[in-house]
């Protein structure tokens, strides 16, 4: 070990003794070699990792966002025994527009209202497509990792070239899986200008610096290679809207108008409030993220905050008083509210004590999914069977989704590009520990059920609910919470595996 470390130091000394240009070229060659190796591993993984099949003889239940399916399941799946009533078709998430928001009232606001997402402007000075977090909200401090996702994009493109097979899976499960909205890389959209900040180029991954050095220097017309966490976050948010408005039993064969209205909000156009352009603009203003730079779970969560969303802070701790101030501010009207838990469940891999609790988050009736992932990529996880988690992979470039003034003008082909029946799965042991977990709370009964469910899990709970936020002076938090925190320095962040 000593000689190896010494050799490493000698190599570094040799590099430092060369001219800056030669040193830079050597570092680039080493990084390029590592990327070629990564691509090779992905190709082999694609060959040896075919579409998953179901063991019919075992007939183990398979879950999709809180619904359980067996081979003889006929229609919508079986939710857990204790569930709340299905929301009415007109139920919506509502947007919060905080005072610090900048911008002018414009088309994105009207598009949001037309889609049934009313905007509360009673205390607002201005409306932004994705406003800055309200004063008093705490910045999330979840370690994030820069991206290297060319290999993931290549692997995913191969996987989705052919239509999915049934693989022995319950047809009702496949119908449910296919009905979830799937946001992917897009190409050919309106250019997102490059940042003029001299630090912007250094913030890009090596892959993106190499890629953009031979391309258009004016900006980005595709998010391939850097936007997968944004797309995973869009998927989570779009499905929260869909379930809130249409109910959990919605399938593609029922009421496509609702889907068109929601898809319109995520078009690859600045006029769409939750477009890639507006995510990037908000990331630059609120999170210090440059165009072309990878977004982590925390930055993505902050960009989603324009809806009525409760965000946890650097601990996986949900405070009831804070939640109620968002969901039921006047004490009389409970609004459907999305809880986003941005957390890290280990250093390089998920600690095994959290495996069962993590899988159970996809079995709760309030489940909206997990945005996060696997080494070298970010996915949107929506299902589970045993120790395997099913996901929608955003690393599949497709033509830009256009903005339609009239959502009814979306074609079947454009809607089809937001869905897939092809299954991909990953063992829980192979998941990256940094993630964003979503839950949709429809009413107070739902809230009470969710609190009980996240507390009584097998293994160690990953979410804790406390009555009061200690920073409000109304309590002292949960005893022992500080002992469970894993302190990580900035240097540790560079070793995390949540690459794009």
UniProtKB/Swiss-Prot annotation:
SUPFAM superfamilies: Cysteine proteinases. It catalyses: [protein]-C-terminal L-amino acid-glycyl-phosphatidylethanolamide + H2O = [protein]-C-terminal L-amino acid-glycine + a 1,2-diacyl-sn-glycero-3-phosphoethanolamine. One of its GO terms (cellular component) is phagophore assembly site. Its EC number is 3.4.22.-. The active site is at 228 (nucleophile), 393, 395. One of its GO terms (molecular function) is protein-phosphatidylethanolamide deconjugating activity. Keywords: Autophagy, Cytoplasm, Hydrolase, Nucleus, Protease, Protein transport, Thiol protease, Transport. It comes from Podospora anserina. PANTHER family: CYSTEINE PROTEASE, CYSTEINE PROTEASE ATG4. It is an enzyme of class 3 (hydrolase). Signal peptide: none annotated. It is found in: Cytoplasm; Nucleus; Preautophagosomal structure. Cysteine protease that plays a key role in cytoplasm to vacuole transport (Cvt) and autophagy by mediating both proteolytic activation and delipidation of ATG8. Required for selective autophagic degradation of the nucleus (nucleophagy) as well as for mitophagy which contributes to regulate mitochondrial quantity and quality by eliminating the mitochondria to a basal level to fulfill cellular energy requirements and preventing excess ROS production. The protease activity is required for proteolytic activation of ATG8: cleaves the C-terminal amino acid of ATG8 to reveal a C-terminal glycine. This is Probable cysteine protease ATG4. Belongs to the peptidase C54 family. Its main location: cytoplasm. One of its GO terms (biological process) is autophagosome assembly. It holds the Pfam family Peptidase_C54. InterPro entries: Papain-like_cys_pep_sf (IPR038765), Peptidase_C54 (IPR005078), Peptidase_C54_cat (IPR046792).
